[in-house]
């Protein structure tokens, strides 16, 4: 194997090392360890509007206590909202089960974090970056790509790829004892039956007990909504309206939001009251191994439902088909950490220009429990849905007449004749059996 000089396998002593600092056990122990071993750690914390984070301002202070040369809090929420809306506009969601999608909320968060934190590091002349991603996951590749896109001179140092760090602090217990031994009164939190990663757009629950498919969604405690499967949790039906202007969500229940962050937070509150957007997915990681996750995304789900309702009422069939096909392709690129690659930008621009621009209107829904909802009304000045065209009643100025339909059907004789000839060829070659007892018995009936 050729040596990758971009990835440093040993601690760069005496050099500035940026670390994506969450304030949790792993990054706290890593920061202190790097400091004691002679590196110059700089801490960067992304404010992504995580629903399970109470006090962002306390995180950089904690980093300084653990020995950071400097610690910065980077507000990434506006950019995250922007990318979330772009994903909605493009339908960039390729993982789904039974029609319920995973809204790629973690990949969107990584695209924002990976670019904005490395950009902040460049301002501080920090060109070595570390984060908490493991070698078996997706994030190690996502951060690698986004980091190098932002700073081509970037070097990567991850304590979790450094054998010395692993030998000395290989587990949560060792990390906790290390902090205590160095004078920090660190109380290790009780481990959950799964791990959680979240941002303003959604939450991911995975690993540990959730690696076993006989552990279902019921072991998860939602952080963005309610446990809708629990009959003891009261969930009342609720009507909600969502308004789009040129593909951008701008209003909820008639109230306009100039700040997309506030819009998302309110959408999360509305959808969360019902457990909307929760899903259980088996997916293929970038390395092709399968993993399983339980996901929450109440606001993304609400916007997606309303947006697609308008798309189907405004655009023609071929446009909708291309929107869906391109959305699947773009969703996979986003998942792989290629959200800013040229092939992804091409697909994004196509959807945002030719699909989203026409999506203006308002959709009213009734939300119930989980992903159970009904669409109550759809309004748009751009609707091509015109029921009078297909009315079963006698109408003046009809779009077409019975005679027109006869002509249209007669034209179909051309391809019907061609199709019948093809079926005969397949029969003669043994690919298709015609006649009595076959899948197409009527075609072989010469009586």
From Swiss-Prot:
Per UniProt, the keywords (alphabetical) are: Amino-acid biosynthesis, Arginine biosynthesis, ATP-binding, Cytoplasm, Ligase, Nucleotide-binding
**Which GO MF term does the entry hold, naming one?**
ATP binding
Q: Which GO terms describe its cellular component?
A: cytoplasm
- Name the residues that bind ATP: 20-28, 46, 132, 134, 139, 197
Which residue positions does the secretion signal occupy? none
Task: Fetch the PROSITE patterns from UniProt.
Answer: ARGININOSUCCIN_SYN_1, ARGININOSUCCIN_SYN_2
The annotated pathway is:
Amino-acid biosynthesis; L-arginine biosynthesis; L-arginine from L-ornithine and carbamoyl phosphate: step 2/3
One GO process term, biological-process aspect: urea cycle
Amino-acid positions noted as binding L-aspartate in the UniProt annotation, renumbered to this chain = 134, 138-139
User: Record's family?
Assistant: Belongs to the argininosuccinate synthase family. Type 2 subfamily.
Question: What is known about its subunit structure?
Answer: Homotetramer.
Q: What is this protein called?
A: Argininosuccinate synthase
Organism, as annotated? Neisseria meningitidis serogroup C / serotype 2a (strain ATCC 700532 / DSM 15464 / FAM18)
Its gene name is argG
